Design a protein with these regions (language model features):
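Acidic/histidine-rich catalytic neighborhood of metal-dependent amide-processing enzymes
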Residues: 50-94
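Acidic/His- and Gly-rich active-site-bordering loop/insert found
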Residues: 1-47, 66-73
Length: 94
């Protein structure tokens, strides 16, 4: 996933990068279904909820806030979600 907010070019760009892939999970080892995103005791449980979906959501919300508030950027802000970190198959070009 890629999105870019353009700045005026007076500063270098910044990349907000996260990975979207997850490691395999054995449902027998989980107290909730690993793909459920279940909320238990005020915490979201599920594959990727900590590594790295949370960071991706924070980055997306940052990008949206910058856009909605019409912040005048000195450099581009690039939002990048990759899909090869867990597999160590670094072929996404990032």
């Amino acid at each position: 996933i890629y999105a870019r907010l353009k700045g005026n070019g007076s500063k270098p760009p910044i990349v907000l990068m996260h990975h979207m892939d997850v490691v395999p999970a054995d449902p027998k080892l989980w107290k909730v279904p690993p793909l459920s995103g279940a909320v238990k005791d005020g915490v979201v449980w599920g594959r990727g909820s900590l590594d790295n979906k949370g960071a991706g959501i924070f980055q997306l919300l940052t990008l949206l806030a910058l856009k909605r508030q019409n912040i005048q950027l000195k450099g581009d802000v690039i939002f990048l979600g990759t899909a090869d970190e867990e597999a160590l198959d670094h072929t996404s070009g990032g």
